[in-house]
């Protein structure tokens, strides 16, 4: 069996690189880099398939990459010509934010603003532990600084708070007592 290793560009890169010279440098560089990556991927996949004797699959892979390359070039052309996009100096393209424009004259914008004013996006309120519960927690802390889960549940029942609150209280109390020492 004879292996054929392909090193020549298989997607007509000379023609494509000639076209790149007429474009501005940002989009030309983006386009050229995309073409290079796709051609390198195609070359390595085709070589691997040909090495194992799968010539039919290699042809299908080539067609797939040709379609990917055409889609890539179409996307670059759309970005260059479309008013929806701006190019950045570092070579990336972003779509302009049109959310506010789309939301104008709709109730969504009013609801959104009302939600901001009414504190819909505030974090959860702190759970307050009553003074009587704090006394019980202090007593339990003096007895044992690291209660296990069963002890935390018992303390939580006695205090009328959740076991999670008990666990957090003990963690915070240990940290406070450590920093004071």
Swiss-Prot record:
Matches recorded under SUPFAM superfamilies: Homeodomain-like
GO cellular component, one term: nucleus
Record-level Gene Ontology MF annotations: DNA binding; DNA-binding transcription factor activity, RNA polymerase II-specific
DNA-binding region listed in the record: 122-181
Endoplasmic reticulum as UniProt keyword: no
Key words, A-Z: DNA-binding, Homeobox, Nucleus, Transcription, Transcription regulation
Gene3D superfamilies assigned: Homeodomain-like
InterPro entries associated with the record: HD, HD-ZIP_Homeobox_LZ_Class_II, Homeobox_CS, Homeodomain-like_sf
Location within or outside the cell: Nucleus
Superkingdom of origin organism: Eukaryota
Miscellaneous comment: In P.angusta, all mating-type proteins (MATA1, MATALPHA1 and MATALPHA2) are encoded on one idiomorph, consistent with the fact that P.angusta is a homothallic haploid in which any strain can mate with any other strain.
Family in the record: Belongs to the MATA1 family.
General function of this protein: Mating type proteins are sequence specific DNA-binding proteins that act as master switches in yeast differentiation by controlling gene expression in a cell type-specific fashion.
Name of the protein this chain belongs to: Mating-type protein A1
Chain's gene name: MATA1
């Amino acid at each position: 069996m004879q292996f054929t290793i392909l090193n020549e560009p298989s997607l007509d890169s000379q023609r494509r690189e000639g076209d790149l010279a007429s474009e501005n440098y940002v989009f030309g560089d983006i386009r050229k880099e995309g073409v290079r990556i796709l051609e390198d991927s195609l070359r390595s996949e085709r070589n691997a398939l040909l090495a194992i004797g799968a010539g039919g699959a290699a042809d299908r892979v080539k067609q797939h990459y040709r379609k990917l390359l055409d889609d890539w070039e179409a996307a670059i052309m759309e970005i260059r010509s479309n008013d929806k996009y701006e190019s950045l100096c570092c070579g990336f393209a972003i779509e302009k934010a049109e959310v506010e424009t789309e939301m104008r004259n709709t109730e969504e914008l009013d609801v959104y603003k009302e939600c901001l004013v009414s504190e819909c996006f505030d974090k959860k309120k702190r759970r307050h532990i009553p003074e009587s519960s704090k006394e019980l927690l202090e007593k339990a802390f003096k007895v044992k600084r690291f209660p296990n889960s069963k002890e935390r549940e018992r303390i939580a029942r006695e205090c009328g708070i959740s076991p999670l609150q008990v666990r957090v209280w003990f963690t915070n109390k240990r940290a406070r007592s450590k920093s004071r020492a």
